[in-house]
């Protein structure tokens, strides 16, 4: 430490000022590259994520209008006497959906599906409601990164309104 102090005192006034300015510039660079730049990059990432999620929500809202409502149901009654779990298992195969978990709960069933095409999911739910009197109680879906139109159905609660 004494050696540094001696070197400092051996410098001319102009050299000392130059060293102080260089230290200040170095400190500003460290603050910018260690704190400000990463923060700005994260902020940009957050904005892009929000924009992408908003686009997904808008797309889902547009697609939701194509789902028929329950009071419009006028399908055939051919499968109304089939139990809800069997109906779910059979109908998901027709739409290329994969059941990961199916838990019957009286007239309701909790379903978890694998990654699914959103349009196929909507058509399947529409058919269940129109032809079989099955209503969606709750639905939790997440968009799959880098796969447009593909969703993860983490929780789907279905209820048969006219249990045979």
UniProtKB/Swiss-Prot annotation:
Keywords for the protein's UniProt record, in alphabetical order: Cell inner membrane, Cell membrane, Membrane, Protein transport, Transmembrane, Transmembrane helix, Transport
Cellular compartment(s): Cell inner membrane
Membrane topology annotation: Single-pass membrane protein
Spans through the membrane: 18-38
A Pfam family the protein falls into: T2SSM
Database matches in InterPro entries: T2SS_GspM, T2SS_M_periplasmic_sf
Cytoplasmic side stretches: 1-17
Primary localization class, coarse: membrane
A Gene Ontology cellular-component term: plasma membrane
Family to which this protein belongs: Belongs to the GSP M family.
Entry function: Inner membrane component of the type II secretion system required for the energy-dependent secretion of extracellular factors such as proteases and toxins from the periplasm. Plays a role in the complex assembly and recruits OutL resulting in a stable complex in the inner membrane. Provides thus a link between the energy-providing OutE protein in the cytoplasm and the rest of the T2SS machinery.
Subunit record text: Type II secretion system is composed of four main components: the outer membrane complex, the inner membrane complex, the cytoplasmic secretion ATPase and the periplasm-spanning pseudopilus. Forms homodimers. Interacts with OutL/GspL. Interacts with OutE/GspE and OutF/GspF.
Name of the molecule in the record: Type II secretion system protein M
Annotated organism of origin: Pectobacterium carotovorum subsp. carotovorum (Erwinia carotovora subsp. carotovora)
């Amino acid at each position: 430490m004494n050696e540094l102090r001696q070197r400092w005192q051996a410098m001319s006034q102009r050299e000392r000022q130059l060293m102080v300015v260089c230290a200040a510039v170095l400190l500003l660079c460290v603050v910018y590259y260690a704190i400000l730049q990463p923060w700005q990059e994260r902020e940009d990432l957050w904005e892009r994520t929000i924009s992408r999620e908003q686009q997904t929500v808008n797309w889902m809202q547009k697609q939701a209008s194509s789902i028929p409502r329950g009071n419009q149901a006028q399908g055939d009654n051919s499968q109304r006497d089939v139990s809800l779990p069997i109906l779910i298992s059979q109908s998901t195969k027709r739409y290329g959906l994969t059941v990961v978990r199916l838990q019957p709960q009286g007239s309701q069933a909790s379903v978890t599906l694998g990654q699914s095409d959103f349009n196929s999911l909507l058509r399947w739910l529409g058919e269940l409601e129109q032809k079989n009197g099955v209503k969606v109680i709750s639905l939790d879906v997440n968009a799959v990164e880098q796969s447009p139109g593909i969703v993860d159905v983490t929780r789907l609660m279905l209820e048969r309104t006219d249990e045979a």
